[in-house]
Amino acid sequence: MFSYSSSISRGVVDCTPELFYQVVRSEKVGKICAEIADAHELKMRGEMSREDFETFKSEHKKRLPVFLFHASFPNGRRISADAVPSGLSIFDLDHISTLPIPLLRTSEKSEGGDAGGHDSLENVLKALKERGCIGKSFSNLPYLFSPSSPIALIHISPSCEGLRFVFRLPEGMSLSDGQKWFAGQLGINDYDVCVKDYARCSFAVPEDYILYVNEEKLFSAPSSSLQPPP
């Protein structure tokens, strides 16, 4: 179980599947992210400076609800000392300048997706690999889209410049160890090593920013059965 808050400054509650979809389908989240996307387009066309875009993005993100994928907080406070680990971890790919938004539009998605318009994990990972977003030569790609895959969620970031992966930690791994392990699975050397706080927030995005979701992995209790590949 992980937590949800209506803003970075509010109390937190447990996030159910119903609440998760209510948030990503909300008019508020869609409107805020659309405004950020419009500003990103202006920046890409040279009509807004990088500095002005960063300010605009930061101010708008503060208005978004947040998920706390790393843990639940029974006391309703976003304090690491109160955290009950969810068994999930997040991994960010930042500043991907070649990333189309959204990467795979619903009308272009291949067979194998779900009823909600999200693509299959295999299709998403192969598309990311082809675009150079993840390692071009590594051996674990088949494992990542197998039934044993740890990946629960992949979505485009609110900034329109990156991706966020949510994945299940193998048994006994800390958040920092999990980051290093997952980077190796993706064939990536440079990543944000600061993602190790149980109280870290993940800003909500609209449902059409979600490239892949596995509800069973996202909402199930921590499992001791997930093991790293050989």
Regions found by a protein language model. Give the residues of each.
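Catalytic "initiation/cleavage/transfer" segments centered on a nucleophilic residue
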Residues: 171-172, 186-226
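Alpha-helical scaffold elements adjacent to nucleotide-binding pockets in ATP/GTP-utilizing enzyme cores
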Residues: 177-182
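A structural signal for short, well-ordered beta-strand segments and their strand-loop junctions
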Residues: 155-156, 166, 195, 203
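Acidic, low-complexity intrinsically disordered tails
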Residues: 229-230
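Signature for HUH/AEP ssDNA processing cores
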Residues: 1-107, 111-161, 168-176
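A common structural junction motif
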Residues: 133-136, 183-191
